[in-house]
Amino acid sequence: MGDSRRRSLGNQPSSEAAGRSEREQDGDPRGLQSSVYESRRVTDPERQDLDNAELGPEDPEEELPPEEVAGEEFPETLDPKEALSELERVLDKDLEEDIPEISRLSISQKLPSTTMTKARKRRRRRRLMELAEPKINWQVLKDRKGRCGKGYAWISPCKMSLHFCLCWPSVYWTERFLEDTTLTITVPAVSRRVEELSRPKRFYLEYYNNNRTTPVWPIPRSSLEYRASSRLKELAAPKIRDNFWSMPMSEVSQVSRAAQMAVPSSRILQLSKPKAPATLLEEWDPVPKPKPHVSDHNRLLHLARPKAQSDKCVPDRDPRWEVLDVTKKVVASPRIISLAKPKVRKGLNEGYDRRPLASMSLPPPKASPEKCDQPRPGL
């Protein structure tokens, strides 16, 4: 992109130079005046600074050293014929060296083609040296120095202020860990105090072993020859847990013969089927609706009648209960007779004896003769 810009900038002065040469050949005095004006503008340092400001900030590497610029001396004016021959010679040389860039100087000035070529080669050589340098590996562990580190400075094009950037590595560890080939395991450095604390104390050993020096307990002969009594054997037997939930239900609940021989009806089979879960909110919380019709009274009477017992039904026990002879000969005591009588329900105020008030239980108070003789206030 930079090369195309240089070519476009270079082609523009070439066209201007060609136009000036034609004007000079035709004898146009404006060509000579413009050439002289261009030469004065280039040689004038103030004009040159204004031109550089109009062109904008360029690459600082493309600027020529001050000694090279100072070494070039351009004549004030030249003869038109000599200037034309000089321009043709420079153009032929640029075509031979394949240089698309042409200086913006006027015809009356000497073109610094050799100086520009040397500066360009010098910049290329400097750029190649920068690219040839290996990149900095920030993952290598290095000690951070206390003095100024590596950095670079630049001048802001908008503000005339100096900026300085200090480059510190952002990572202070390395991905490769150095393997120690001398040791297979890590041996920590244990101090003498740590070794003393790691030894078990004698008090704890005696406490846990019940003051026994050996794990084999000595058993006396009397304990070996002792015969346990029946009570001790009964107490030594483990208790059977009375877990009702863990016992098999076949031993607890026995199905009767009538339940085994029962034949379910169609209604029972219908009720035994599981209901489908409701999906709508109205089904979960139904709103009671008024009955559209009155139920049949004859149907209710039919349902109220006792059903006849089926011949296949085998009851668990005889409906006629057998009364024992001992029960028939029992004589009831007066206490049992009093308890057998039902309580007589009375009304709310029937047979209720209210507790007498204090004024009703005591005699009415009487005033003393002294109080009777005293004059009453207000009379």
Curated annotation (Swiss-Prot):
Basic and acidic residues: bias regions: 19-29, 38-50, 347-356, 368-379
Composition-biased stretches (Acidic residues): 56-76
Tissues/organs with expression: Testis specific.
One GO BP: cell differentiation
Cystine bridges: none
Stated role: May be involved (but not essential) in spermatogenesis.
Name of this protein: Sperm microtubule associated protein 2
